[in-house]
């Protein structure tokens, strides 16, 4: 029985069986004498030394001991069986729990996969919504930019109104002049009053001196009158009179001091008025000088235009001519031709003698005829030039009038569109009348020019007809005279050839002038766009207003520079600055109001966005200083359990790591794996949420 193996499920070593079979425990049937062993044959000495009764008693004891051991073994076996069954039940429960946990983990994995898929879909939708919000914000930004442009336009309108207000400075200057005159008159009155008050003051001082003498005399008398009680009333009266006189003298001194202050103010005002008058006179002189300079500038511009036209004429002529390249060549050729002509005339004159006086007379007649023809040709060319100029001017004026009429129609249409007030009808009617008068004047000028052109053409026809008449030939000329005539005719033919050359040159100049005229007409039609008359009343009025505005600005700057040291400012400047300040305040209030509205809308939208992010991702995101981001999970035990991410300075919109905290030490394995090794912050946040969720669930199960 000692070889029976012990049960493996018995966890406590101190069992009854082990205590029973321990070698140190003495046997209950062992005596001082030797007893037979259970496993061996007793010796002969021991067997013969004991009696049968003792053997029976010993056997009984061993039997009882064995029964006791058997009962103990049975109990031990029952306890071991109970423990084994309990252990088996615990193992089955643990195995079942592990199976449940594995199934739960499997279901959790499926749930997390589905959840991650849903989160990715929601993240995608959030990104799309974020893009739509960004586009909406961009649209709002564009609308705000449009509003800002509108505000800028409003500011420009206000500035134009401010310029209009500056035009009122002229009236205020006149007001200042009247005020200066009034101030000068008031200063004169004040000076007179000061003189009167000064005389009154001297008289008052004399009276004070007299009263002081009287007081001293009365004091002496009072010493005498102290002994008599009857004169006390007289003394009191004198004292009251003295006090009244002193009060009156003090009042006079106060009035004199006030008058001195007023006199000083009047003197300063008079000085200012003198300064203003000097400035006005200097400004008027400058304005007159400016008018003279403008006239000189206009004359210089006209001279420049004339020189440009002459240079253009020479340029067009030289482009058509193949012989001449510069104006100097043309002048030298002309002088050469004149010299040749003079030499020919001298040679022709030297060949005439007394015998051929009649031939000379005929030659003279022919020469006169040639000269008349040349003069007529020159006159015709001049008339042709003047006619062309008149035609060009009439065409120009006609185009100007047509364009002006077109522009005026458009301007009238614009006036009809912009007419708002009742007074606009009268102004428009006045403008229409002025423009109609101007159009009639242009038409009359056109008709006059056409009449002059017709008269010039008729005169040219008459002169040509008169010049073509030939003198009748003399029948009494002899044959020698005829031969002489033939020689002279040859010379005249040569001269005629030369004249024909000049005529061809003139024809070339005519062609060049016509080409230049065509080019000018084309350039005039293509480049020039006439919007108004040269002497437009509106532009003239605007120029006058602009010049007045410039002078007023200069005067205002000069006056402001002179009044910098004084504490007072002009009333007009103060009112203008107050109006500008009020406009700026209104603009600032409107911008602050719009900014406050945008701020409220942005706060509401940002709160909605944060709530949506918190509901979808499980994290509350807070933006800290220096572009740090604080992230707190919804499964955290407290608000202090959060992570703070550091921004990456090299990459915009990315993070470099996590700031060390007790929570990072607690989840160091997740931080090391996802943040330090993988650099994947979304997976880190997802793993952290899962870990916190499992911890929260385990704490809830343990609490339940």
Curated annotation (Swiss-Prot):
Region (Disordered): 1-53
Any one Pfam family match given in the protein's UniProt record, by short name: MAD
Coiled-coil spans in chain: 53-603
Sequence ranges of Polar residues compositional bias: 21-49
Keyword Membrane: no
InterPro entries: Mad1
GO biological process, one term: cell division
Keywords: Cell cycle, Cell division, Coiled coil, Mitosis, Nucleus
Cell location: Nucleus
Main location class: nucleus
GO cellular component, one term: nuclear envelope
Family of the protein in this entry: Belongs to the MAD1 family.
Free-text function comment from the UniProt entry: Central component of the spindle assembly checkpoint.
Name this polypeptide is given: Spindle assembly checkpoint component MAD1
Organism of origin: Yarrowia lipolytica (strain CLIB 122 / E 150) (Yeast)
Gene designation per UniProt: MAD1
């Amino acid at each position: 029985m000692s070889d029976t193996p012990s049960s493996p499920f018995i966890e406590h070593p101190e069992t009854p069986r082990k205590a029973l079979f321990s070698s140190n425990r003495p046997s209950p049937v062992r005596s001082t004498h030797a007893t037979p062993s259970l496993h061996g044959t007793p010796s002969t000495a021991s067997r013969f030394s004991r009696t049968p009764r003792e053997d029976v008693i010993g056997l009984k004891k061993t039997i009882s001991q064995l029964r006791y051991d058997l009962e103990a073994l049975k109990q031990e076996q029952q306890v071991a069986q109970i423990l084994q069954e309990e252990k088996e039940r615990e193992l089955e429960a643990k195995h079942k729990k592990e199976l449940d946990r594995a199934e739960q983990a499997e279901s959790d994995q499926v749930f997390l996969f589905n959840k991650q898929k849903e989160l990715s879909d929601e993240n995608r939708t959030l990104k799309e919504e974020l893009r739509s919000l960004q586009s909406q914000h961009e649209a709002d930004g564009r609308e705000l930019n449009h509003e800002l442009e509108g505000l800028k336009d409003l500011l420009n309108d206000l500035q134009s109104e401010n310029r209009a207000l500056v035009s009122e400075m002229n009236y205020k200057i006149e007001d200042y002049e009247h005020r200066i005159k009034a101030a000068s008159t008031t200063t004169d009155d004040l000076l007179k009053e000061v003189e009167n008050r000064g005389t009154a003051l001297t008289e008052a001082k004399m009276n004070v001196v007299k009263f002081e003498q009287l007081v001293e005399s009365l004091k002496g008398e009072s010493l005498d009158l102290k002994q008599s009680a009857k004169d006390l009333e007289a003394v009191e009266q004198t004292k009251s009179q003295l006090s009244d006189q002193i009060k009156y003298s003090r009042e006079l001194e106060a009035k004199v001091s006030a008058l001195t202050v007023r006199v000083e103010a009047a003197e300063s005002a008079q000085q200012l008025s003198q300064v203003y008058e000097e400035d006005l006179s200097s400004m008027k002189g400058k304005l007159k000088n400016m008018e003279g300079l403008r006239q000189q500038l206009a004359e210089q511009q006209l001279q420049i235009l004339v020189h440009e036209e002459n240079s253009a004429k020479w340029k067009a002529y030289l482009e058509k001519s193949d012989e001449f390249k510069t104006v100097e060549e043309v002048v030298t050729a002309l002088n050469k031709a004149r010299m040749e002509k003079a030499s020919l005339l001298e040679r022709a004159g030297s060949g005439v003698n007394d015998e051929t006086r009649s031939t000379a007379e005929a030659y003279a007649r022919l020469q006169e005829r040639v000269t008349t023809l040349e003069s007529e040709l020159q006159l015709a060319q001049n008339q042709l030039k003047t006619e062309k100029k008149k035609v060009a001017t009439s065409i120009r004026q006609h185009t100007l009038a047509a364009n002006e009429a077109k522009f005026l129609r458009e301007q009238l249409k614009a006036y009809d569109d912009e007419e708002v007030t009742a007074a606009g009808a009268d102004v428009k009617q006045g403008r229409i009348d002025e423009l109609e008068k101007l159009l009639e004047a242009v038409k009359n000028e056109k008709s006059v020019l056409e009449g002059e052109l017709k008269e010039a053409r008729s005169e040219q026809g008459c002169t040509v007809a008169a010049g073509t008449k030939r003198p009748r030939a003399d029948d009494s000329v002899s044959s020698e005279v005829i031969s002489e005539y033939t020689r002279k005719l040859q010379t005249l033919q040569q001269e005629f050839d030369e004249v024909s050359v000049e005529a061809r040159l003139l024809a070339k100049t005519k062609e060049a002038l016509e080409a230049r005229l065509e080019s000018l007409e084309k350039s005039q039609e293509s480049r020039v766009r006439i919007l108004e008359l040269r002497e437009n009343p509106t532009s003239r009025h605007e120029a006058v207003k602009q010049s007045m505005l410039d002078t007023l600005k200069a005067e205002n700057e000069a006056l402001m520079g002179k009044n910098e040291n004084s504490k007072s400012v002009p009333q007009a400047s103060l009112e203008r600055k107050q109006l500008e300040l009020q406009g700026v305040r209104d603009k600032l209030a409107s911008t602050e109001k719009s900014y406050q509205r945008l701020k409220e809308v942005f706060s509401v939208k940002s709160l909605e966005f944060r709530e949506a992010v918190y509901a979808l991702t499980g994290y509350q995101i807070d933006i800290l200083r220096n572009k740090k981001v604080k992230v707190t999970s919804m499964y955290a035990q407290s608000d202090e359990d959060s992570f703070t991410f550091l921004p990456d300075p090299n990459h915009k919109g990315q993070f470099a790591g996590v700031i060390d905290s007790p929570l990072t030490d607690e989840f160091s394995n997740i931080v090391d794996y996802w943040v330090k090794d993988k650099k994947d912050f979304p997976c880190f946040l997802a793993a952290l949420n899962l870990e916190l969720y499992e911890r929260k669930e385990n704490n809830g199960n343990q609490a339940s």
